Every structure is written in C-alpha cells, then in structure tokens.
C-alpha cells in the first residue's frame, strides 16, 4: 500500500476524536457497524443508482453488511472502476453527487430519506468485487460531529490536531498513518 494509491476520505462535519487504523495486514480497512438510526433508504437509493447490482434486500443481510464510516481509505483504482461501471463519466458521477447533496436537503428527501452514502456505495462495491483484498472491521467509527461538538464543548488546539494527523512515530497513532 502506498499513500498515492488511496484517497483519504473524511466527512466535512467531523471533528477527529479517536484513532482508527485505516490499514490492517497490508490491506485497507472497510469499517461496518449497526446503528438503529441507519436507514434502509441508503440501500434503496444505491440499488436504483446501480441498476440493482449493489442492492441488499433483506433486513438481516442489511445489518450484516452495513458499511459506514466517518473516515476511510478509498482505493483510487476501485473508485475509477466503480464510476466506470455505473456512470458514463466522472462528470456524470459528480453531477449525481451534487444533485444528491441538493436533494438530501429538501423537505421531501428528509421525509423519504432518498439520499446516498458514498461510504456505503463504495464499500458495497468493494465487498462484491474485491472482498479478498480488504479487511472488514466491525467497529463503531463514529466521531463527534458538529452538533455533538457544540454540546460537548471538547476542544483541540491547532497543535493537538496537527499532532494527531502527523504522528507517525507510534504504531497505530495518527489519522493518516498507513
């Protein structure tokens, strides 16, 4: 694994509050967790976007394969592969994600939960087509988001955040450690 082979993806509204190994046994990690707040709508939307190729139909299977993380490594090659399989171009995929961002903030999208998780779509794709090349880790990856941050009033100095990101001295420490 090299750093240039992967995108490091983190949600924009996340405050780093815990360390996660993004690599295990020389393979990128796909995180999965179950959460009562998770909605089947993610799956329905992904199923529509991929013509049913990445669909999960039973609740039991959904719980066992519920991929989501606030930060994760996306392999560039697999991202290109996935976009090429389900979309005509990168531009079409970007338009799709922009429209998704717009729709998710509308009242009817909130009501019907018609939006997509890039983490779930990517993870379902990798699990289906590259399962032997990843490590699947069942863990609670949730970080403190902007709403929890304001409630908890936990703050990090710029220096502390910089140290968390850059620390490569200690095994397993540092958010960007490969």
Task: Briefly describe each language-model feature range.
Residues 8-10, 176:
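Hydrophobic/aromatic beta-strand patches that form the interior of the parallel beta-sheet core
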Residues 11-15:
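The conserved acidic donor/metal-binding loop of glycosyltransferases
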Residues 1-6:
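Active-site nucleotide-sugar/metal-binding loop of Leloir-type enzymes
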């Amino acid at each position: 694994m090299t750093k240039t082979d992967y995108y490091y993806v983190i949600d924009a509204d996340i405050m780093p509050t815990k360390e996660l190994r993004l690599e295990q046994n020389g393979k990128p990690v796909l995180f999965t967790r179950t959460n009562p707040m998770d909605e089947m709508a993610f799956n329905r939307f992904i199923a529509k976007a991929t013509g049913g190729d990445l669909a999960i139909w039973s609740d039991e299977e959904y719980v066992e394969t519920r991929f989501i993380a606030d930060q994760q490594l996306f392999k560039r090659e697999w991202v290109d592969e996935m976009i090429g399989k389900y979309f005509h171009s990168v531009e079409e995929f970007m338009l799709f994600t922009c429209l998704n961002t717009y729709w998710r903030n509308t009242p009817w999208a909130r009501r019907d939960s018609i939006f997509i998780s890039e983490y779930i779509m990517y993870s379902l794709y990798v699990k289906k087509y590259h399962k032997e090349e990843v490590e699947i880790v069942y863990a609670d990856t949730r970080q403190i988001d902007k709403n929890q941050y304001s409630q908890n009033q936990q703050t990090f100095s710029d220096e502390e955040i910089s140290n968390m990101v850059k620390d490569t001295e200690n095994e397993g420490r540092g958010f960007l450690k490969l």
